[in-house]
Amino acid sequence: MRGNEEKMNYENLYQTLQPQEKSVKDGLSSLQKLFKAVLRETESGDIKSLSRDIGSMADAALALSSALEEMKDSLGSFDTKAYFESGDFAAQMLAACEEKGVDVRGDFPVYEMFPYRVRLDTENQDVYLDRKKVQCMRPQSLVSTVQTGQEKLNKASFNALTFASELADAYELAVLKLKKNPGADLYLTSLYKFLAPMSRFRKDYDQQSFAFDLARLYISGINETKNGKKLQFGPSRNSNKCIRILDADGKEVFLATIRFYQDPASEI
């Protein structure tokens, strides 16, 4: 981090580019109108007007070129590498999260905005949203993208009972493969591998997606499968085995294990 030097902020560049973009837009509009006039004058044989408007087009083209050069100079003066390496981008991203109410945790350069994982690549000035590279130098825009994605996920249809039953099936397979006793606590991270056994499946259904589904199951309050087996989440002292989710109130909850068991009362 720099000492007393002025902090970089994309919003300052954005404000600088706004009037320059307007100049470019106006220049393009002027050229388009003049070109239409030139086409009409060429067809009608109006040489005097044609000569005048071609001259006007040349002047408009020079003005447009000048406006584009100003934009290039503004962009050239913005050191993207320093913006990332100084921590200014990260600090403004965190501020945008607070402003927009997006939950975030982690430390530079890796953050979690549940259920997304955000990584800042300072060497190449790239942002990764999970595995996807996002070309974004504006913290506010990045956080808005995350927020939109979260809203889309939350609106997507989800059958908690069906998911619970799928988990139960994977659990039974895991109990057999791992030679555990029925009803034993199994780590969710281990169960995930049975739910998505092949690597190509994990690309489409990664652990962040798994965590999001766990959160929706947790929030649903469902604690029994279709065939009557009870399910119970559990904690762990091993933080590496915990999966962080957010509850209905946006508070973080750490889940580590799960077990499915037959309620003795139901067997009577």
Predicted segments, located by residue:
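Short secondary-structure junctions and interdomain/linker hinges
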Residues: V38, K100, V104, A174-L178, ...
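Positively charged, polyanion-binding regions of nucleic-acid-associated proteins
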Residues: S157-R200
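Short amphipathic alpha-helical interaction segments
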Residues: R202-G221
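Generic structural motif
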Residues: E123, K132, M198, D263-A265
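Non-catalytic, well-ordered alpha-helical scaffold segments
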Residues: F114, D121-E123, L161, S165, ...
